[in-house]
Amino acid sequence: MENKILEQIKKSETAMLDTLAQIVNIDSGYDALEGIDEVAHIIGDFLTPYGFEVQYIETPNARTHVLAKRPRPGKKKVMLMGHMDTVFPKGSAAARPFRIEDGKAYGPGVMDMKAGIAISLYTVKALLDNGWDDTDLTLF
């Protein structure tokens, strides 16, 4: 099963990079709360078809948080955590949009941690598509 999961993740590379480009090209810095909200909803929209209960936690004058749960009675429990905000000010996504150059991805937040978000989403998809239905999954 492990090889099937890795194989699927490799086959998902183009879709994963498309998702990464989508979220990198959204300003979601400390001064772009609406961008953080947009990224949160992209995450929620991705997970909902897989049976996740998605909750958007709003805090006054701060960013939106996503709590996505897919509770299952099995023994396996997986929790993935990350953050959607970057240190880059508004306008950074337009000034330095996502690109791949010499096999490396560039753009605001690629390394911290928008690539981690894309990887998490497609890992969850691969697990569920390959028989991990009894696994309790939580993303925050």
Q: Where do the PLM segments sit?
A:
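Acidic/His- and Gly-rich active-site-bordering loop/insert found
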Residues: 2-108, 128-134
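Acidic/histidine-rich catalytic neighborhood of metal-dependent amide-processing enzymes
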Residues: 114, 118-140
